[in-house]
Amino acid sequence: MTSEQFEYHLTGKEILEKEFKTGLRGYNPEDVDEFLDMVIKDYSTFTQEIEALQAENIRLVQELDNAPVRTAPQPAPTFQAAAQPAGTTNFDILKRLSNLEKHVFGNKLDDND
């Protein structure tokens, strides 16, 4: 149920500022009765809305209680080669490879050119 389904006649300010006309014997009873009828209708409307919202709240809480628990997806682990120290770049690897080749093959590489 939405609040559009309920019709409100008075605001708190209107109730506070309401002045009744007085007749010879006090307030005009018809004015007082009309005003009190509107107050009663509003209280009835508020009561209905409160009951509807409480019922909806109970329903939603039960829905939550019965819903399966979902966890946030875990990020996929990133692969990092164990042989590479942190911060090693391709340039560093190529430089190390070049030094290794020079050490293993020595001058043989220069002779083939």
From Swiss-Prot:
Protein's cellular compartments: Cytoplasm
Alphabetical GO biological process terms: cell division; regulation of cell shape
Pfam family, one: DivIVA
InterPro entries in alphabetical order: Cell_cycle_GpsB (IPR011229), DivIVA_domain (IPR019933), DivIVA_fam (IPR007793)
Ranges that cross the membrane: none
Hydrolase as UniProt keyword: no
Predominant cellular place of this UniProt entry's protein: cytoplasm
Any one GO cellular component localisation term in the record: cytoplasm
Keywords of this entry: Cell cycle, Cell division, Cell shape, Coiled coil, Cytoplasm
Gene3D superfamilies in alphabetical order: 6.10.250.660
Coiled coil location: 36-68
Keyword Cell cycle tagged: yes
Subunit structure of this chain's protein: Forms polymers through the coiled coil domains. Interacts with PBP1, MreC and EzrA.
Homology family: Belongs to the GpsB family.
Function summary: Divisome component that associates with the complex late in its assembly, after the Z-ring is formed, and is dependent on DivIC and PBP2B for its recruitment to the divisome. Together with EzrA, is a key component of the system that regulates PBP1 localization during cell cycle progression. Its main role could be the removal of PBP1 from the cell pole after pole maturation is completed. Also contributes to the recruitment of PBP1 to the division complex. Not essential for septum formation.
Matches recorded under PANTHER family: CELL CYCLE PROTEIN GPSB, CELL DIVISION PROTEIN DIVIVA
The protein's name in its UniProt record: Cell cycle protein GpsB
Species name: Listeria welshimeri serovar 6b (strain ATCC 35897 / DSM 20650 / CCUG 15529 / CIP 8149 / NCTC 11857 / SLCC 5334 / V8)
